[in-house]
Regions:
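Substrate-positioning beta->alpha
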Residues: 149, 153, 181-186, 199-222, ...
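Conserved Rossmann-fold NAD(P)-dependent oxidoreductase catalytic core, especially the SDR/UDP-sugar
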Residues: 104-147, 169
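NAD(P)H-binding glycine-rich loop region in Rossmannoid oxidoreductase-like domains
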Residues: 44, 55-101, 109, 124-129
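N-terminal Rossmann NAD(P)H-binding glycine-rich loop of SDR-like oxidoreductase domains
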Residues: 11-31
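Mid/C-terminal beta-alpha module of Rossmann-like enzyme folds, strongest
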Residues: 220, 224-287, 303, 319, ...
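Short alpha-helix in the Rossmann-fold core of NAD(P)-dependent oxidoreductases
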Residues: 98-103, 119, 150-151, 207
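Flexible, glycine-rich beta-alpha linker
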Residues: 128, 166-185
């Protein structure tokens, strides 16, 4: 494991029970770091898997400044991955508390405890719908929803700390996918069963990052001297189109890709109506405007800065990553022929 080489490196990972955070925590442990995870429920299944992997658990909530301070104590590295994502059940204030205020708590605690390196995980979504592709780290901000706005507010705190001399690095991932994540399951399932429909022309740009490459980028941001004070987009070597992504998924599940393209405006109107009807009751609407953005918002980025300055090199091309993800879904029983039913 190399513990003798990195025994003095102690890393806190927030969001370690989530998809990206769990992969990162295990990767750091494999490199020889002592890894600590801030978790709300140490008895939860994901937390238990961390503990089984030799990761220290400390109980607390990411929105609790005192809990964060205790978690940061005696750490040399902090990887702040925790965030709240898009659901209809959270208020705008909750997004701000977790995606902005908690960043401040992490930065303040890291400063108090003399942490050597801090990595803040932002999102490429701070750029919103990209007008000219590929975008880069200097592209104007254009957040399109409360999640993106709150993530931008958190990143601004990290940038401010970096300008003040804190050893902060900021990573903006493109769409993260791979084994362990079920956010793309609906796409795989509907393509497999023939019910997926492409709204719009299908030529909108789409940029993904396989989880192993994402973890490599995060670790480089936390270790490479050139990363301090900088912002890096992390993603695959190249972007694709929506039609290209769907074609890869179809290949991985063994079906022909859909050829029919439907108009997107009626779908957006339906999504808007669903959200307004469901929000007063705290119900997660069956259709979100954010889901419609999947068909309309361009997301394509250059990762040249990370490659040139950090030596970042994506290793898993889209076709391989999609195939690996499909295989994991099969193993979980979530695709046809696997004999199980998804939770």
């Amino acid at each position: 494991m190399g513990d003798s080489l990195l025994a003095d490196r102690r890393a806190l990972v927030t969001g370690a029970t989530g998809f990206t955070g769990s992969h990162l925590a295990h990767a750091l442990r494999a490199k020889g770091y002592h890894v600590r995870a801030l978790v709300r429920d140490p008895d939860g299944a994901n937390a238990k898997r961390l503990a089984e992997g030799g990761i220290e658990l400390i109980q607390g909530d990411i929105g609790d400044a005192e809990a964060i301070d205790q978690a940061v104590a005696r750490m040399t590295h902090v990887f702040h991955i925790a965030a709240v994502y898009r659901t209809a059940n959270h208020s705008d204030a909750y997004y701000e508390r977790i995606n902005r205020d908690a960043v401040g708590y992490v930065l303040e605690a890291a400063n108090r405890h003399g942490v050597e390196r801090i990595v803040h995980c932002s999102t490429c979504g701070v750029h919103g719908d990209v007008a000219e592709i590929p975008a880069n780290e200097e592209t104007a901000f254009n957040p399109g929803d409360v999640y993106q706005r709150s993530k931008l507010a958190g990143e601004m705190l990290a940038q401010e700390a970096a300008r003040a001399g804190a050893p902060v690095s900021i990573v903006r991932p493109t769409g993260i996918y791979g084994p362990g994540d079920d956010r793309f399951l609906k796409l795989f399932r509907t393509v497999e069963n023939g019910t997926f429909r492409v709204f719009g022309k299908g030529d909108i740009a789409y940029h993904l990052t396989y989880i192993d490459d994402m973890v490599d980028g995060l670790i480089l941001a936390g270790e490479h001297p050139a990363a301090i004070g900088e912002v890096f987009l992390i993603g695959d070597d190249s972007y694709t189109t929506l039609d290209g992504l769907v074609a890869e998924v179809a290949r991985a599940v063994g079906v022909k890709p859909p050829s029919l393209h439907l108009p997107v405006v009626p779908l957006m109107l339906a999504a808007t109506a669903c959200e307004f009807a469901c929000r007063p009751f705290g119900i997660d609407p069956p259709l979100h405007r954010r889901r419609v953005a999947f068909f309309t918002k361009a997301r394509a980025f250059s990762v040249d800065k990370a490659k040139d300055r950090l030596g970042f090199q994506p290793k898993v091309p889209l076709a391989d990553g999609i195939a690996r993800t499909a295989e994991w879904y099969r193993q979980e029983g979530w695709l046809k022929g696997s004999g199980k039913t998804a939770a």
